């Protein structure tokens, strides 16, 4: 099977699921069915087979990568006479709305923290770095929420820089999907983890210029490994609509929900609205800003129509 548009065969090793599964070797499965139930995203397929076939080999690869980074750090410590501080290994996970990147992040967190060499694994989403709704409204960006310009990029860069500088505590803002806004006064405090997983739509995007005198800092400057969760656009669109319909029957009915008004729509109206949101916001964002970053990832998980990973593409060293 040919690589996707924009991916050079010279850059990536392309593995079918069976070949990837064999790379698990003797890696044990530390999760039970009930653990996986708590990690599954709304409307997503996730079972023990998916964890064993896809995510155990990935956790093994990441453990090797982290171990190599730790050995390099130890060598640098010896070279410098013990004058540098160990810093978190940062894994970025990118992909479209509804593609399953949040589930991927939660699974990897659960697996990686069970490896003895790096038990402290934190997960942070970039949702908290969205500008608050009042700022987005003032800038006429509410319909561009999720696009690069809707994020406080400077705050996100500062967060990552402080982590890599070895700060004892670094705070990330908290986002509520229920109220569809950043929560004032709340923060997720990250305290020198062994690994930090950063999950978000546009984490692999190249930074815009902050003026004409010097290039901006890229988020990827801080990443040790990056993953792109991929699927065909028509599948992601269908998953998004199905997720919207499930949310309409559950979370949207909460009186605190920003989308409470949508809970009263009939089935056809809900589908029409979800299709409209995809066509006007999520689809263009995927095409213009998210999918073009795929080639920057170290590893790509390609899903089939059933949400199962069919192929894995690993960038050559």
From Swiss-Prot:
HAMAP family from the UniProt entry: Pantothen_kinase_1
Family stated for the protein in its record: Belongs to the prokaryotic pantothenate kinase family.
Organism: Myxococcus xanthus (strain DK1622)
Major localisation: cytoplasm
Gene assigned in the entry: coaA
Entry protein name: Pantothenate kinase
Compartment annotation: Cytoplasm
Pathway annotation: Cofactor biosynthesis; coenzyme A biosynthesis; CoA from (R)-pantothenate: step 1/5
Binding positions for ATP per the UniProt entry: 95-102
GO biological process: coenzyme A biosynthetic process
InterPro entries recorded: P-loop_NTPase, PanK, PRK/URK
Gene Ontology molecular-function annotations: ATP binding; pantothenate kinase activity
Keywords: ATP-binding, Coenzyme A biosynthesis, Cytoplasm, Kinase, Nucleotide-binding, Transferase
Reactions accelerated catalytically: (R)-pantothenate + ATP = (R)-4'-phosphopantothenate + ADP + H(+)
GO cellular component terms listed in the entry, alphabetical order: cytoplasm
EC number(s) per entry: 2.7.1.33
